[in-house]
Amino acid sequence: MRTSTRPGVRWMPYADAVSPWSNVASRASSALAALAAWSLGAALTVALVGCAGRSGGAGSGAASPAPASRSSRDASPAALATSPVTSTREWTWRGVNGIQVDTHHWTIRSSLRSASFTGSLPAFYEAALRNYRTGLVPLPAPPKRLETCVFGTRDEWARYTEHRLGADAGPYLGMGRGGFTSGGEAVLYDIGPRDTLSIAAHEGWHQYSQTTFRSALPVWLEEGIACFMEGFRQPLGSPEPVFLPWRNTERYAELRSSARKGRLSELRAVLEGSPQSFLAVSRDAQLSYYAQVWAFVHFLRDGDGGRYRPGLERMLDDAVRGTIGERIRACDALDARGKRLAAGAKSGIWLVTVYLDPDFDSFERAYDRFVGALLESNGWDRILRGECPIDLPAPAPEGAP
């Protein structure tokens, strides 16, 4: 997969497996009705209720829920004063009827059957963007509104996918549950509130990087950060989620399951691969890949006493500025051939050498220790609270060897 300001395609099939903590989704969904009123205001919620009764396609999406209750439509003035919504209008596409919601940074087109679910999207997306811009290193605002389509059924999503991707649609139509991003636009469908929002956060990172970064990140970092951005908690009664990168039960469960089943790959294989190359092996291999790059970004941020965080921050800063190539050319740890290969590579260990550690073997051992500690932790309580499941060593003092 390639992150580019030019039209490109990236996608993320999402796990169908139910984690040991699947009841998290039911708790999160209880806040969605109130979220609609706080996020969009009473007028928009009423408009959405009108859309919810339409006939839909014969896809695999969830059945249309009952309209939002009166209490969920009674927005408080204080909440409405901070609404991220700038405009709303009806939206139709080839017989699909829905609503378009514009915020300061997003254009969201929805044919979701649930008014409250649609109502939750503006606040969620604006909070997600703030997380992209602050979760790892300060990053700039996108140069334009980011566009998202969230369909109410898989059938609607499939028809739009064929329209959007043409002859390239086949692999996406064949995946289980998921979404994709093409040319900065994310295309999703309803697979339940919690999972849909997790995919929205993942694909939203791809939208942000495609439109904002001048240099592409390596695949392992692009996908790893997208997974890192998935974790969130929805406080009951709050219009906005709290993003917590460790609160990702699917990735943590998959990491542990892959280890038990002997499916974890060596770090070099992860860095040299891609979601497509792992999917060519099996869907399980691909899900293991996503879990490993999720853990890898946590390692880069916090592992080995925070040793690698400055390099991670430099790489992101250079991607924004478009200066990754300059950094490669200035790297003394690579010879001329290595610099040529690094400049043209979308994956591999080259940027580890440039930004993180010239001694890859030592770097890999540190990563293995970090993942080993995660696997031994069985820290479900901490994961559910959005906390690191292991006790991390304190960062080394500034200037220490």
State what each model feature region is.
Residues R6-P7, D74:
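Short linear motifs in low-complexity or flexible loops
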Residues A52-S55:
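Bacterial signal peptide processing site
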Residues A58-T92:
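Post-signal peptide N-terminal segment of mature Sec-exported envelope proteins
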